[in-house]
Amino acid sequence: MKLTCVVIVAVLLLTACQLITADDSRGTQKHRALGSTTELSLSTRCKSPGSSCSPTSYNCCRSCNPYTKRCYG
């Protein structure tokens, strides 16, 4: 009888912890590394593909073509 009560209480506590954790994690990403790179790319201003660029200024989102001096993505 005591063991049954302990198991029921443990299951209820674990279920409550799962529900609380699920509510807190809404809108966040599962992997922290992906979240940090996403935040970095959203917070930096970069030029869209086809915009003029300089290969040394690193202002394109991906890369700058040194021959055409245009961003490509």
UniProtKB/Swiss-Prot annotation:
Disulfide bonds join C46-C61, C53-C64, C60-C71. It holds the Pfam family Conotoxin. Keywords: Amidation, Calcium channel impairing toxin, Disulfide bond, Hydroxylation, Ion channel impairing toxin, Knottin, Neurotoxin, Presynaptic neurotoxin, Secreted, Signal, Toxin, Voltage-gated calcium channel impairing toxin. Expressed by the venom duct. The lineage of its organism: Eukaryota, Metazoa, Spiralia, Lophotrochozoa, Mollusca. This is Omega-conotoxin GVIA. The keyword Transcription regulation does not apply. Residues 1-22 form the signal peptide. GO terms for cellular component: extracellular region; host cell presynaptic membrane. PROSITE patterns: OMEGA_CONOTOXIN. Belongs to the conotoxin O1 superfamily. The modification Tyrosine amide is found at Y72. It comes from Conus geographus (Geography cone). Has a very low activity on Cav2.1 (it displaces [125I]MVIIC with an IC(50)=1.05 uM). It comes from the Eukaryota. Changing Y58A: Strong decrease in activity. It is found in: Secreted. Coiled coil: none annotated. The modification 4-hydroxyproline is found at P49, P55, P66.
